[in-house]
């Protein structure tokens, strides 16, 4: 049985550090989740000596979650084991380098004019770095300086500073040869979102839709020629990773809404959906890029005008309830194969466009959707109608005696005038949310009880005309 507690001493005395960089990389796979989390699988071929050594796995993500790192030997797993691993994220900068030399001697080179006024001469002095708090303090042989009079020359880079984030593993190799190693780990700083662009037809009865995936890399590392996969769904995470700060990004390959592109392959994964890009791609550090997700043409859509009331209308006397009320405009479609879709739609923003009289695509509104499985309906609010307005008023109200278990019993009547300035007739859906138990006593239009507390009226309004919805209701609670 190997005594584990002796490993740090053995490695500190005799272990040889073997560096590996992206030059050794054989393959790379990146799986990104919706929750600012990604799984990295980095395969490299590294020449390891037999026995104990330190492997410095360089150019890993700066936001790696170290406790998730797993190193596998795919070539010579026999007698291969890891005793300890450390994530070195103290990166080399001029400030850090000077800080590490507090109490140590450095050489300061300054330039001064020659006495004869011809040219300049270099002066080299040794100094001890006393402190770096809010500026450098240097002690020379004859004085103390609080600013650096020239450039500093350091004898070497301290071993605890790294140029790039590095995972250092103390391990034992069973063979002296080149070996294929795979490092898997979770990291923050990589995330994706779906965006959709939809073009409405001239008659607003169909649309073409394309979906794009926007990838953002703020993890502090680059991922060249990676197999890219995306997981759509709400994966549970015990400790959510903090969202990265907004900063200036490099944009690469941002998409337009026209033209067809290869779509990402989709498959089920547990209770989620996995999307795989059909080609390797490079995610540069501090970069945002887009890749095609899906596309569909001639998807049937439904246009809806909606006026929604409020439940407080029915418990008091209000009279005028508003003039020129906004009427929402919605478009809906079915995510079915029969409607030219039938694909899982990751959550994201759907932006809708329509061509003007000259053929130019104009933006007409956007809405967000949640993860939407196939065979579900999608409904988007694009804005409020300009030419279709409403006026609502309460024409009567009275409180009735208590009845049975109901202490609050009210009877009230309403009149909703809907005006249409368009050159075509429209149908407006009026949703009236009613509290408690309710009963429609009189009505000018038919209605359906959409839910236990909602009455739904459909009001046809002629072109350049108006219609009036009237009803009387008794509510009890």
Language-model segments: residues:
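Sec-dependent signal peptide recognition
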Residues: 1-8
